[in-house]
């Protein structure tokens, strides 16, 4: 077992005592960093970067080299690697985001989808995890991740990004049996994928339910949360002599925190529309919380960033069980110095809550 030099991220997820509130940031390896842009240019395009374990490792480590305050690394990859491995043919259209060459539109299409084997069909991701773990050498924990079944299904049925999820929701209401068949297959695929990452060295995993908040309350419970619970139930929960915590993040899921707290996950990610103090009261100590500063605060000056960090820390209050993060990913236009001011403020201002 690798001895972790800094395990406060894992300790906070398990609500164990920490000296300061740990911090990391969704999309911390990303386009706001000039060093990331240079490595991406070297790779040629986004998917070539994802599929090269050495370059994926390089960009994963870049934010840690720049910001010594970071308490976790997150695997550099994309949620759509799973549908790509199911044969849909992922590509990126400039200005339009991800697209698939094949779409899923019928029960026959769903029946034909394979459940990918992580080592055989997504071996480049597993190789990246192993490479990153080796290079981290116990510096901080490594987070693995996947998209949720519902979120992946929307891309597969729409053929890419969507504003209204028209085709996905039409299938959900017109042919719920077909949607359940797709989600069942995706739940099996995601479980295998995350377990593959854990065996390769991921020390915590996050399920990104980016589009769960687009659903009605009843549909969320049936078509998103139920399948995430199934994944949590199927995950390897102890590896290398440690608990492997699971973080469940539904963007727009603030109405359903009580239900999410019963998922079996150790922590819930919050977007910035929730008040973290209210969220803490609502989940009643069942889970840790991650979040939840509005990413747009990073456009403001460092004093304003510091003030918002102070406000969120005060709303959470004393004790462990909080991992500081943004409420969604950092945006490409942010000044890297502002991200640094954010990380510094979290560590400096949170110590008083852990005495």
Curated annotation (Swiss-Prot):
One Pfam match: URO-D
Marked site positions, Transition state stabilizer: 78
Lyase listed as a keyword: yes
Enzyme class: lyase
The keyword Coiled coil is assigned to this record: no
Key words, A-Z: Cytoplasm, Decarboxylase, Lyase, Porphyrin biosynthesis
Family note: Belongs to the uroporphyrinogen decarboxylase family.
Protein known as: Uroporphyrinogen decarboxylase
Gene of this entry: hemE
